[in-house]
Amino acid sequence: MVMKREVVGYTTMSEHLIDTQLTRSPFFFASANQSMLGCGVAHAFQQAIPFAELANQAKQLLQQAKRDECDNPLLFGIVPFDPKTPTRFMIPRTLYVSSSPRLNRPAHLTRQVAKLISSPSGEQYKQGVSHLLNMFHHSGLSKVVLSRAIEIATEQEIALPTLLRSLLAINHHGYTFAASLDEQRKLIGASPELLVAKRGNYLISNPLAGSRPRSQDAQENAQRRASLLNTAKDLHEHGLVVEEVERIMSRYCRNLYTPMVPSVIETETMLHLSTLLEGQVSDPEVCALQVAADLHPTPAVCGFPRESAYQAIRELEEFDRGYFTGMVGWCDARGNGEWVVTIRCAEVGSHQMKLFAGAGIVDESLPQSELEETGAKMKTILAAAGIELNDVLTA
């Protein structure tokens, strides 16, 4: 079955296709430059496989599409945090592409009344942080990302097109996505973190680690930005991530450039330390997904060393992350692609939402501060949906 590609105006994408196609679309993915929406499924794969096999499996699916007389098909995928969870790849029957719409925030976002279905207490999360701090003194662990999840139910139906447009409006410089999990649920998010992109012969990665909640007061926000760049704990946490990403990127790049000091980027709710790594690929045949699979999961969402952090997460987190802190993105038959870290996301149904957030725990972490960080991160999706749960996010 041939994949058809159609370029449309950004108004058509944002005002027509998102409204009429999103609910049954297998995926939507937007970066700062372009938006893509798939309709129908020409080829699909869903199976738990080792991350080392991701690139080969994607190539097989893309080759099937090329045999259908499509010169450069595009594959969309969601990859889990744990390889025991199925990876999902699909190639659409029709791919709509536009420049990314510059949407304004909704003037009057309908407020949703929501109630908690399940939520671990803040004390429980802080106990997990304290347990990790004790572990650091007698193990080889340097960092563990500890996460939590909350489930809520809403009185009114959650309008997926409205939620997605709200995220697009606050995420001009990041990556906004929606992927079908089943007939009832979608994975929707607004990630600020680029795991890797390949454009021709160039590779780019933009790891984020070290965070503060963003303040609406300009003076306070400036102080928080300065604090991020001047606090040993945050610089140490960020350095662990950058060092590991640089080590892996150097396998694939020549002339790899890594800035010596980080900068600060802002999202709607957070400030993050950021480092942009750029290089030329040594082998033009390398595909974006191969590099992404080697990087995944970075210390920004798992910890360091990787396997020890995995084990600590399995012991301390009482829920299955699923696709949270996995990766979501696309690649084409020529090896180009963009893969982003699946954060600031939720599993969304018609009247239910499961939200996730995590914080990087290092030796200098404070349990209450880490709890507040996870609450601030959850506000990205909650605010876009018109839901306020401030009291339960940090208690």
Curated annotation (Swiss-Prot):
<dbReference type="GO" id="GO:0008909">
    <property type="term" value="F:isochorismate synthase activity"/>
</dbReference>
<comment type="similarity">
    <text>Belongs to the isochorismate synthase family.</text>
</comment>
<dbReference type="InterPro" id="IPR015890">
    <property type="entry name" value="Chorismate_C"/>
</dbReference>
<dbReference type="InterPro" id="IPR004561">
    <property type="entry name" value="IsoChor_synthase"/>
</dbReference>
<dbReference type="Pfam" id="PF00425">
    <property type="entry name" value="Chorismate_bind"/>
</dbReference>
<comment type="pathway">
    <text>Siderophore biosynthesis; vibriobactin biosynthesis.</text>
</comment>
<dbReference type="InterPro" id="IPR005801">
    <property type="entry name" value="ADC_synthase"/>
</dbReference>
<dbReference type="GO" id="GO:0019537">
    <property type="term" value="P:vibriobactin biosynthetic process"/>
</dbReference>
<keyword id="KW-0413">Isomerase</keyword>
<protein>
    <recommendedName>
        <fullName>Vibriobactin-specific isochorismate synthase</fullName>
        <ecNumber>5.4.4.2</ecNumber>
    </recommendedName>
</protein>
